[in-house]
Each structure stands twice: as structure tokens, then as C-alpha cells.
């Protein structure tokens, strides 16, 4: 947990949904494709100034963090999934705290179900406010998190052009119905087991990881980026120069074309011109 909080950095994108059915489709697509984003953005190959054996150490750390509140949420793909099922999941996520009168009250491991009944050991006789529920929603950390929006949580941090590329990727996939349907067609045949194997392989293998159905994640990334580009083009949002949003995907196109996650470039520099001195990263890559 401390490694996650103190040693990792992410870029996240929050996206709206228009209805329960829209939420379900977007949730499923974004969960299934989250490892593709992880591979495209993977850029955390160092720990304590040395290579750590991972393309995305940040993503790996999440595999060793409280399983009760992390992961790929296979129940999202079950028939009948909707708001109620996610509420049931959150009610079973152990609590961390209750915030009252400007202070945090330790409720670690206690049950929100008991809180609803006024039987929370940390606050006996009290029932939750809606703010307590909102706080509790923020204490689960799956690969995609549901609130009043969907939160994409798979990408490592990076330079400004990748910061702009992440929302372009997900907006392109999720905000045009044709693109969303195409993305769902791409992933709907993947089993829960295949999704988990993909998620587990990407932190260490990046774009070289095997993809469901054959080929590599790098090859799959080209198809995903094509769908996202079509979605952005269909949106037709343009700037003052008449350019649409597709250009924001170009950094990801270059990564996919190279077949190497950004971590590979960092490792090449570390082993080459940096001569094993990671402090040179600050001179070359600060922004």
C-alpha cells in the first residue's frame, strides 16, 4: 500500500454515462481494454534507481494491494449487472473511516452494511449520511471505478502529450456509439480468465504480452487505436484551425508502431547514454 501511495504516478480520465445500460456497456469495454492502455502508457521500469523487471511497476503494485478493493471486477460481465450489483460490491468492501466534525474516525475493516443498520462499532447508534457513502465509494480501487462517472485507472503518468492522449483514447472509444459497439465486438468474446491473464501479463511484458485470441497486445493496440480514431472523427469536434481530436492519438500511434512500451525507451537510455545513472532522467525528461 505504501509503495502504491508514495512511489507511483498515474494519469486518469473520468467519463460520463447517460443511462444504466450505457454505463454497463462502457464499464465492460473499459475494463476489458484497460490493460491495453496500461501497455501503451507503461513507463515505470525503475525502483531505487535500478531496473525492476517491469514495464509498469505501478500496475504490478496494484496486484499486491488489498484484493477486497482492487482488480478487474469479473461480476461486471455477469448477466443482469447494473447499479444494484455494484452497490452490493461496495457494501462488501471493508470500510476505512468515517469523517465527522472535521476528524477521521477509524473504521478499518468494519461493514457499511452494519453502518446502515446503526450498528457500526466505530459509531454505535449512528447511521450514514450520503457523504459517508460517497467517501466509501472512493476507497475501492479497481481498474475502472464507478461513481457518477467512470474512472479509467490503468495508465502510468507521463509527459504532456500522453496526458492529452489518454482522454482522447477513451473518449474516442466510449463517446461515439459506433466506436463503442465496435470496441464491444472486439472484447465481448473474451472470457474472464483471458481478461485476467491479460491484466497479469501486461505489467511485465507491456506490448509484447499475448492478447486474447492470439497475437500480441501491441497488435491489438493498433485495432483499438483505429476504433478510437474513428470515434473521435465521428464526434467532429474541431479546434480553431479545423483540426479534429484524432491528432491527440499520435503519440500512442508511434508507441504502437514501435511495438515497445515507453518503459523500453527509458531502459534503453539507462543502459546506453545514461550509463546506468538514473539521475539523468531529470535533465532529459522533466517538463
Language model feature labels by segment:
Residues 228-287:
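C-terminal amphipathic alpha-helical interaction region
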Residues 36, 40-43, 143, 176, ...:
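A structural signal for alpha-helix termini and helix-coil/disorder junctions
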Residues 144-145, 153-241:
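Substrate-recognition/cap regions that form aromatic- and gly/pro-loop-enriched pockets
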Residues 1-145:
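Loop-rich catalytic cores of soluble enzymes, especially ATP-dependent carboxylate-amine ligases
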Residues 31, 44, 48, 55, ...:
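Residue-level signal for alpha-helical context at structural boundaries
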